[in-house]
Structure formats: C-alpha cells, structure tokens
Amino acid sequence: MKLLVSPINSEEAIIASIGGADIVDVKNPKEGSLGANFPWVIREVKAVVNGRQPISATIGDFNYKPGTAALAALGAAVAGADYIKVGLYDIQTESQALELLTKITRAVKDYNPLKKVVASGYSDYKRINSISPLLLPAVAAEAGVDVVMVDTGVKDGKSTFEFMDEKELKEFTDLAHSYGLENAIAGSLKFEDIPLLERIGPDIIGVRGMVCGGDRSTSIRQELVEKLVAECQA
C-alpha cells in the first residue's frame, strides 16, 4: 500500500517527505474533510518536496457546482498538484456526480493529461446526504477519473470503519480495480487498522491524525510517518 500523508503547510510537508510518505497531500482541515488550501501553499509544498514525491491537493467538499469545481481543479493543477482531489459532498444522484467529475476531469486533462483526478466519496454518506461510495467507481470510470477514494465527511474522530465494514470496503476496492481505477481509503485510520487494511487491499491509504499522534489539529511527527511507512511496506 502507498501512503498519502496530508500536511497543512510546507514545514509539515518536509516532515512527511523526509519520513517517507509516497504522496504528499495538501489540504486545509479548517475548511472541511477535503478542505482546499491556498494556491501559494501548494506551490510552497511543491518547492520544498522538490520532486521526491508527487503532490496531491484537495479542492474542497463539493455539492453540485460543476463550474466552480472545474475552475478550482484547474487552479490546483496550475499551482503544481499532480493529483487533484474532490469530495462529492451533498451530491444527490449519480448523474450529478457524473457531470461534476466529467467537468473536473476535462479542466485538468485539457491543461495536462498526465495529472490525475481523484474522486472521493464518504463512508458516512448517510449523515451528510450524499451518494454511496459503492456507486462511485462506475461513475468515476465513465468520467475519466484516475483514482476513487473513501473518507469521512465529518471529522469528529469516528473512523471510516464505523460506517463501512470490511466487506463493503473490499467491495469498493474490487469495484475500483474492475474499472481499472486505483483506490484509496482514509478517514481517522489508526495503526491497529493496518492488518484489516491489508486484507481489504487498497492501493493507497490516506492519513493525517494517525501521524499527528491521534489529533489531526496538532502537527505531523516524523517518527510516526516512518513507523507507518515501515508497517505499510512490511
């Protein structure tokens, strides 16, 4: 499994990079689960990582606003992100998801076809009034997305595993692979979840709180990144 670590600034990005993360992800927790950070922060992170890892950037937890989302996605791509991540938050139907993701993908790929688009559903979709992550792989594949992900929409300490069980997450992973997509799992993951994640088999796991010592509002610690890298590679 690849490890995606989400710093909030260039100082944390250096720690994540030196610690051995496979992907350095720029987000802004103050603005939500997949809260967008500023273009200059993406550029700063890109500069300090200096090619050691690809950079991903979140553009927000989006309801049905394809134009706004497409423009935000292009902004993240221009700022230097290699992966552009969008959360489908309060998306009511598969047709809404398809249009949103199609427009985002076009905005990114017209600029640079080598950049990857990541579509995230939410394990707690029922409490945020959005579509099931199990519907996402088929829609994402049709839209030309590269990676599908599941995360928690509400960051209250509850884990993805409290909303989707091993069977459902395995189904999500297998569906993604059946459509030729990479997939990722995130959402208040803990070190003790690693054996379960290995059974499920995602390509990528996404973390912040786990490498902050359990509190995503504190700072990333290099020794915890290194510990997690070792466990993911074991």
Swiss-Prot record:
GO BP annotation list: methanofuran biosynthetic process
Keywords: Lyase, Schiff base
E.C. code: 4.2.3.153
GO MF annotation, one: carbon-carbon lyase activity
InterPro entries referenced in this protein's UniProt entry, alphabetically: 4HFCP_synth, 4HFCP_synth_arc, RibuloseP-bd_barrel
Record field: catalytic activity: 2 D-glyceraldehyde 3-phosphate = 4-(hydroxymethyl)-2-furancarboxaldehyde phosphate + phosphate + 2 H2O
Catalytic residue positions: 27, 85
HAMAP family per the UniProt record, alphabetical: MfnB (MF_00681)
Protein name as annotated: (5-formylfuran-3-yl)methyl phosphate synthase
Major enzyme class: lyase
Role of this protein: Catalyzes the formation of 4-(hydroxymethyl)-2-furancarboxaldehyde phosphate (4-HFC-P) from two molecules of glyceraldehyde-3-P (GA-3-P).
Name of the gene this protein is made from: mfnB
Family under the similarity heading: Belongs to the MfnB family.
